[in-house]
Curated annotation (Swiss-Prot):
Protein name: Cytochrome c-type biogenesis protein CcmE
Its job: Heme chaperone required for the biogenesis of c-type cytochromes. Transiently binds heme delivered by CcmC and transfers the heme to apo-cytochromes in a process facilitated by CcmF and CcmH.
Primary location: membrane
Region (Disordered): 138-161
Length: 161
């Protein structure tokens, strides 16, 4: 092998090795920030297709309805505990130590993100409340043939008289 060909081969191998190292570091970083979404039934019984349950200490997102009558607030702090259930009957307890969103209510849909504990409770770091199901974006309303118009102040005033 002549020196020029040997130099090209060394450069190609180094380039491929560098790309492989960058790709593996990128995949490792993405894997550590991955939040898998589960329903309460999937946490209790495992995923329907694989039977895999989330492990304790794993960061996950849980979506479901807040069980009516399950919310317990600590009067001396922001700590709140509530249960989240789904239509399949699964239920998981969620603890949260911050201000709840304004739309949060019992019987309302939520998504909670946090770490699953050894006891099966989710220690939430973020709670997102879903919007009212009756809300319809203007684009959807327009597609359905409904008209949503805002009255300006002069029209509201004349309508009131």
């Amino acid at each position: 092998m002549n020196p020029r060909r040997k130099k090209r081969l060394t450069l190609a191998i180094a380039l491929i090795g560098g790309v492989a190292a960058i790709a593996s570091l990128l995949l490792y970083a993405l894997n550590s920030n991955l939040n898998l979404f589960y329903t309460p039934s999937e946490i209790v019984n495992g995923k329907a297709d694989t039977g895999v349950k989330p492990e304790a200490g794993q960061r996950i997102r849980v979506g479901g309805m807040v069980t009516v009558g399950s919310m317990v607030r600590d009067p001396n702090s922001l700590h709140v505990q509530f249960a989240v259930h789904d239509s399949l009957g699964g239920e998981i307890m969620v603890t949260y130590d911050d201000l709840l969103p304004d739309l949060f209510r019992e019987g309302q849909g939520i998504v909670a993100q946090g770490v699953l504990g050894e006891d099966g409770k989710l220690a939430a770091t973020e709670v997102l409340a879903k919007h009212d199901e009756n809300y319809m974006p203007p684009e959807v309303a327009e597609a359905m043939g409904q008209k949503h118009e805002k009255l300006d102040y002069s029209q509201q005033k004349s309508a009131a008289q």
